[in-house]
Amino acid sequence: MIIKRLNFSCRLFSTASTSTSYEKTPIQPATKCLQLAVIGAPNVGKSLLTNSLIRCPLSAVSSKMDTTTRNISASICSDSTQLVFVDSPGAVSTSHVRQTMKKTSATSGDRVLQDPERALQRAQHVLVVQDSTAPGAYIHHRVLHMLHRYSHVPSILVMNKIDLVMRRSDLLPLVEILTNGQLSDNQQISTKPAQIGRLGKSLSTNIQSSSSFKPSDEKWQSQFRELIQKPTWKCSYSETRSLFRTICGWSGFERVFFVSSLNGEGIDELRDHLMSISPQGEWKMQDGMPTGESAQQLCIDSIRAAVLDTTPSDVAYTVQIRISEWEEQGEVLQIVGEIRCQKPRDGSLIIGKGGKRISEIGRRVNEHLHSLFQRQLYARLIVTHNGKLITQSK
């Protein structure tokens, strides 16, 4: 195994207006910084949204749930202002972590469960990401629980994936439900009758929002007081689902933004707004380096995302990935990534007939890393079981 600790600086995005090194430039009183938590249900596009906001493909993304398994900090600087985003895992249950993600040990699953709330603990603002095409008009009950626990932190509702919505007018009545018909400044949201739901599919309107739901039942009030004192990850999935089963929205949103993280629609407006509300403060991250993550960890994330996108879930979630070689050869960074499988047949499945699947995984990884690091590199992937190399599909 060869891993050299190189002075490897990923040439990631940096705005042109900040031309000098952050380390060489003392913090000025006029600098501004806003720390944001990006939270939401699984697979709503939190990572792609973060990438779009920082103009860098930092977080690995895939079409599968649970691509992000820990908090990832990312930043962007413009003039004297820095935005620091914490992209968090989707809010899931303990059983999901064990059964779907195949994380059976307490330590391996802890970050998936706890990191969404950890992202909120130091946040000055919250971005709640909602899939505009998702069936059902409600904010996920785990997200609602966190919003109630951190109600003192200002929040923004981000309606993502609007490029997939056939009729944009459908979004207004949906947002009315998700915001309880108003924003935190008591501004009313006016709408007209329209169908809502996945791509225009009509949805039953016998829904009760939390603004009209005023529980008088002492049992409910007692349950609320008890659960709101506990971190979300310490509440069972059934507890939060039962608590918020008739509550669909959150009245505390300051603003609502409609965006497409895929094609960039609405992203500039959201970023500009966040820049405009940033308070004075010292920058938290180095200018020109939008993350504190190591290059090796970003490579592992990229390989995992490519495996998730190309391999059946029952195999993809069980593999372990490590970097076995990371070495400069001239101007080219040579990387060897090892995909460790639980069973030999899993390795054969990942390699695919004639090596087609592993070739596709490698193509995706190299394409992403080249875009991320902006330098010459080559990532070679090997598949192993119990330390033995699997060379072909059987």
Swiss-Prot record:
Signal peptide: none
Region feature (G4): 160-163
Null mutant phenotype: RNAi-mediated knockdown abolishes fertilized egg production and there is no egg laying, but animals do produce oocytes. RNAi-mediated knockdown causes a 25% decrease in the rate of oxygen consumption suggesting decreased mitochondrial respiration.
Binding residue positions for GTP: 40-47, 87-91, 160-163
GO cellular component, one term: mitochondrial matrix
Region (G2): 66-70
SUPFAM superfamilies the UniProt entry points to: P-loop containing nucleoside triphosphate hydrolases, Prokaryotic type KH domain (KH-domain type II)
Record region (G3): 87-90
Membrane topology: Peripheral membrane protein
Region named G1: 40-47
Localization per record: Mitochondrion matrix; Mitochondrion inner membrane
Domain annotation Era-type G: ranges: 32-280
GO BP annotation list: positive regulation of egg-laying behavior; regulation of aerobic respiration; ribosomal small subunit assembly
CDD domains according to UniProt: Era (cd04163), KH-II_Era (cd22534)
Protein name: GTPase Era, mitochondrial
UniProt organism field: Caenorhabditis elegans
Gene this chain is encoded by: eral-1
